[in-house]
């Protein structure tokens, strides 16, 4: 059991090192995309399933409340938090539309959709991205594996942050770290610290 624990930590560290080498440009582009949208008076819509939903909620909460330092609230909405809306849509046998309907209702040109999907093939996330495209929104996609169907939907203005791994647990860990990185970059770009 001890060796398995060490192997989990080692694999996680190796994934972090690979991501640190492969992803800085994509993360930087994503952060600047989010910052520019906020500076233009727009908002960020976020969605994901399971652990990805938790990462989406964490991002939205960090924007609305704060990340590590006090600052004004920033407009972000996690689309997976309203159980009444989600179950009403799902009850009409529209499971694949639970996020797309919300994107069509709440999204506007200039807004950003932060779509989180480890494999990039979740039907409801794919449909949300398709809806965001019709609303002239920009997409920041957090994926893994080969990017899945989601990667093929992205245009030149969009950003994919694809974790270099084929293990869902490692991808989800790195998605959380990436969300924290994005929050840090947004805060330090919009509200630079005097002592930095």
From Swiss-Prot:
BP GO terms, sorted: carbohydrate derivative metabolic process; DNA replication
Sequence intervals crossing the membrane: none
One Gene Ontology molecular-function label: carbohydrate derivative binding
Top-rank taxon, per record: Bacteria
Annotated ranges, domain SIS: 34-196
Alphabetical list of PROSITE patterns matching this protein: SIS
Entry keywords, A to Z: DNA replication
Protein family according to the UniProt entry: Belongs to the SIS family. DiaA subfamily.
Described function: Required for the timely initiation of chromosomal replication via direct interactions with the DnaA initiator protein.
Name of this chain's protein: DnaA initiator-associating protein DiaA
Protein's organism: Shigella flexneri serotype 5b (strain 8401)
């Amino acid at each position: 059991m001890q060796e398995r624990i060490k192997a989990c930590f080692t694999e996680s560290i190796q994934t972090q090192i690979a991501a640190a080498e492969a992803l800085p440009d994509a993360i930087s582009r994503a952060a600047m995309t989010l910052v520019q949208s906020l500076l233009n008076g727009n908002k960020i819509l976020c969605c994901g399933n399971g652990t990805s939903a938790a990462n989406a909620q964490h991002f939205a909460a960090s924007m609305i409340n704060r990340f590590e330092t006090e600052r004004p609230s920033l407009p972000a909405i996690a689309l997976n938090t309203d159980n009444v809306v989600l179950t009403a849509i799902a009850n009409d046998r529209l499971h694949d539309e639970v996020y797309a309907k919300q994107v069509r209702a709440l999204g506007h040109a200039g807004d950003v959709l932060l779509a989180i999907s480890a494999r990039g093939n979740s039907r409801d996330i794919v449909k949300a991205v398709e809806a965001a495209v019709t609303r002239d929104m920009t997409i920041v996609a957090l994926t893994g594996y080969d990017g899945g169907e989601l990667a093929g939907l992205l245009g030149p203005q969009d950003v994919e942050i694809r974790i270099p791994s084929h293990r869902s647990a490692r991808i989800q860990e790195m998605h959380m770290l990436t969300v924290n990185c994005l929050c840090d970059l947004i805060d330090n770009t919009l509200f630079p610290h005097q002592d930095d």
